[in-house]
């Protein structure tokens, strides 16, 4: 059987809700309850369409600690000066107002599969009949020797959009004349293969305007990357010799940094 959105909703509507809601009250205790953990693009979209397509027949709870979500997609356009930061931000008010979703701003710290409960950092418990876990992507600790999350303010990653993106742009704007912007590209596999090279392109666009003698150095452990021919053609046409990429043949697969 194909498990699509319609199938999921039909299955959830057929479920019998027998658990109480001691900490987070659902609007209708007799309805099946779906809990979504994670309010990024995936989780928020799932919560929205379950609530919308069920026509109120399913109680939907979205657990997300942040009150504002900034998309990583399009954040490169902010770095390049094509978008404002506030255009990347999304609150959760419309999910509650338009679709009746119960938005809970806490960290989810555990799941009890037997009791069908999600534990919250504040000690609360959220009951469910169906559970969707959409926590998003995260860093692989130790993937770049010498760097961990404690160094993110000195050497921002900006792959989780928000304050990190703003910090990275501020550091780019403050680069000395003729300075060097360095980026360690990730090895395969990772989300959005063209993303690092789109970022380089936008940083180059900004530097061409404010610091045209600056250089960009990419340490790339991959022998080739997504849309490489198009990127390299565009870099040469628009930015001349500003961008240099070092591949594994020159040791980029054994990179370390010192924040």
PLM region spans:
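Core beta-strand elements of the Rossmann-like FAD/NAD(P) dinucleotide-binding domain
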Residues: 122-130
């Amino acid at each position: 059987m194909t498990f699509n959105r319609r199938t999921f909703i039909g299955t959830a509507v057929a479920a019998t809700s027998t658990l109480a809601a001691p900490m987070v009250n659902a609007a209708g205790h007799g309805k099946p309850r779906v809990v979504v953990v994670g309010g990024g693009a995936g989780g928020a979209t799932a919560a929205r369409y379950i609530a919308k397509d069920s026509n109120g027949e399913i109680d939907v709870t979205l657990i997300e600690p942040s009150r504002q979500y900034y998309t990583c997609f399009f954040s490169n356009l902010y770095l390049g000066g094509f978008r404002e930061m506030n255009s990347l931000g999304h609150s959760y008010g419309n999910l509650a107002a338009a679709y009746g979703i119960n938005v809970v701003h806490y960290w989810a710290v555990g799941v009890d599969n037997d009791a069908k409960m999600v534990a919250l950092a504040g000690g609360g418990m959220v009951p469910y009949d169906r559970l969707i876990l959409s926590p998003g992507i995260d860093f692989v600790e130790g993937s770049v020797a010498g760097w961990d999350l404690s160094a993110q303010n000195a050497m921002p990653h900006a792959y989780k959009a928000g304050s990190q993106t703003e910090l990275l742009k501020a550091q780019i704007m403050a680069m000395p004349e003729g300075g060097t912007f360095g980026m360690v590209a990730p090895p395969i596999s990772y989300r959005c293969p063209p993303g690092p090279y789109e970022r380089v392109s936008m940083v180059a666009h900004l530097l061409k305007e404010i610091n045209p003698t600056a250089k960009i150095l990419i340490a790339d452990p991959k022998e080739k990357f997504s849309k490489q021919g198009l990127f390299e053609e565009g870099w040469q046409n628009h930015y001349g010799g500003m961008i240099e990429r070092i591949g594994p043949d020159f040791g980029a697969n054994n990179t370390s940094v010192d924040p």
